[in-house]
A protein has these predicted regions:
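Functional surface patches built around histidine and acidic residues
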Residues: 1-187
């Protein structure tokens, strides 16, 4: 995969990534046992490189400049057909059927669900959303710890109500996919 003309190869030594991309802006823990090296200083070249035992083991990008075996961001999603049987690769399309992002992760299930991993996931989601928003010329979001704390407490209160039913979450707007879609589409 290339991002902004810079190559990322699975199984490459981490020193190659550091020489090519520089020091990551952040290193996040994952539930899969490896670390994400997060490059988010320029959302038009946003990428995350999974590193374990000093080797590249995973990658993700939704950069507008990515290229993977001749497939580029914005190409017709049908170009990914050759990889349908390869569970290590996941390709994501935008609402118009164009290739939007690629994930290479040979691990299917994570085992670590610690507080630090949950925090990392929230930061990664914010970066992925901001990269998408940047690609579509929308204002990026800035993390607000006070708002995060208030939202967390509000969701805990909601979930602890005695009359809680599983479908109430979806009906009330707490459905994570609905929230994600609203974040991507809002100005």
């Amino acid at each position: 995969v290339t991002v902004g003309g810079k190559e990322i190869r699975v199984d490459a030594n981490v020193s190659t990534i550091l020489d090519t991309f520089g020091e990551p802006n952040r290193i996040d823990q994952t539930e899969y046992g490896f670390e994400w090296y997060v490059y988010d200083s320029n959302y038009s070249e946003f990428c995350m490189v999974g590193v374990e035992a000093d080797r590249v083991c995973a990658l993700y990008t939704n950069s507008s400049s990515f290229d993977f075996n001749g497939m580029k961001s914005g190409d017709d999603y049908s170009k990914t057909a050759d990889y349908l049987d390869n569970r290590c690769y996941r390709f994501y399309a935008d609402s118009e059927g164009h290739l939007d992002s690629i994930l290479y992760n040979p691990r299917y299930r994570g085992v670590d669900d610690s507080t630090s991993v949950k925090r990392s996931k929230s930061m990664l989601l914010l970066d992925m959303i901001n990269s998408y928003r940047s690609k579509h010329n929308k204002t990026i979001y800035v993390e607000d710890s006070d708002m995060n704390a208030a939202a967390w407490l509000s969701s805990l209160d909601f979930m602890n109500e005695k009359e809680y039913e599983s479908d109430v979450v979806t009906q009330s707007g707490y459905d994570v996919f609905s929230v994600y879609r609203q974040l991507l589409e809002s100005d």
